[in-house]
């Protein structure tokens, strides 16, 4: 998980401006098989970007490449004025199944703050803010492993957001959650968005995409088929693949 850099006084800071993110002629191959092909797009600060597509379209793979967990076979991923090293420190990623420490709820956030060199005297306020926004402050002393699935995902989000990353990648963050837990996660994402963090996420849930997306990247068979404002995509899709997907038809 990439986090913000910290100045000598121990304060989190937003160094170079990351956005826009520009992806150009991106390819990714494994064992001679091309999984992502000729993908190009630009996304700016502000709009929430939702990556849609059927299973196997390459959605999660695209997020991992943009986050720097994987290296492209060809093409470029460029972050405005930030070097790759700075970019990694100014972004975070949360996965479908949260990976939490076998410690208390609060200690999971303490850990990332300590890694970033935040002085102990400043951590408490940052931990309290993150847990409060996630609705987890009353559970601060509880072991993370006894939290419900929805609470664990909110903890993963709170931990990722504690240092105010400029960009937050989310890979199917509510795929295994019930409607109530999904609603709580979406409310937290709304708050994170309102603080200025850019959200780029994948989802299979068309209802969720309609609720959250400001712009849509639609992938099919490893290719970017459509990139459009959410309203335009849902009201007037341009490709036969997107039309079929929105109609609930199976794509392969």
Sequence positions of predicted segments:
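Conserved ABC ATPase "signature" region
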Residues: 121-139
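H-loop/switch region of ABC-family ATPase nucleotide-binding domains
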Residues: 203-204
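Helix N-cap at the start of a conserved alpha-helix in ABC-type nucleotide-binding domains
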Residues: 179-181
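A short, surface-exposed alpha-helical micro-motif characterized by mixed small hydrophobic
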Residues: 209-211
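Catalytic Walker B motif of ABC-type/P-loop ATPase nucleotide-binding domains
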Residues: 168-171
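Helix-to-loop junction immediately C-terminal to a conserved catalytic motif
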Residues: 67
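Conserved ABC ATPase signature
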Residues: 143-147, 151
């Amino acid at each position: 998980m990439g986090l913000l850099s910290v100045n000598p006084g121990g304060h989190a800071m937003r160094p170079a401006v990351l956005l826009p993110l520009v992806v150009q002629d991106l390819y990714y191959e494994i064992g001679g098989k091309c999984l992502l092909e000729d993908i190009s797009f630009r996304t700016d600060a502000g709009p929430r970007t939702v990556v849609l597509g059927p299973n196997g379209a390459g959605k999660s793979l695209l997020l991992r490449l943009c986050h720097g967990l994987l290296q492209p076979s060809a093409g470029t991923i460029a972050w405005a004025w930030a070097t790759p090293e700075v970019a990694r420190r100014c972004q975070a990623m949360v996965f479908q199944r949260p990976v939490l420490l076998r410690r208390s709820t609060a200690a999971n956030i303490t850990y990332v703050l300590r890694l970033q060199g935040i002085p102990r005297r400043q951590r408490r306020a940052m931990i309290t803010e993150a847990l409060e926004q996630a609705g987890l402050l009353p559970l601060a002393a509880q072991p993370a492993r006894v939290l419900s699935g929805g609470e664990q995902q909110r903890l993963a989000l709170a931990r990722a957001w504690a240092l105010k990353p400029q960009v937050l990648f989310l890979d199917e963050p509510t795929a295994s959650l019930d409607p109530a837990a999904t609603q709580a996660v979406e409310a937290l994402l709304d708050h994170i968005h309102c603080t200025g963090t850019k959200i780029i996420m994948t989802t299979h849930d068309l209802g969720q995409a309609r609720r959250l997306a400001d712009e849509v990247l639609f992938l099919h068979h490893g290719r970017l088929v459509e990139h459009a404002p959410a309203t335009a995509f849902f009201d007037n899709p341009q490709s036969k693949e997107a039309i079929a997907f929105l109609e609930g038809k199976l794509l392969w």
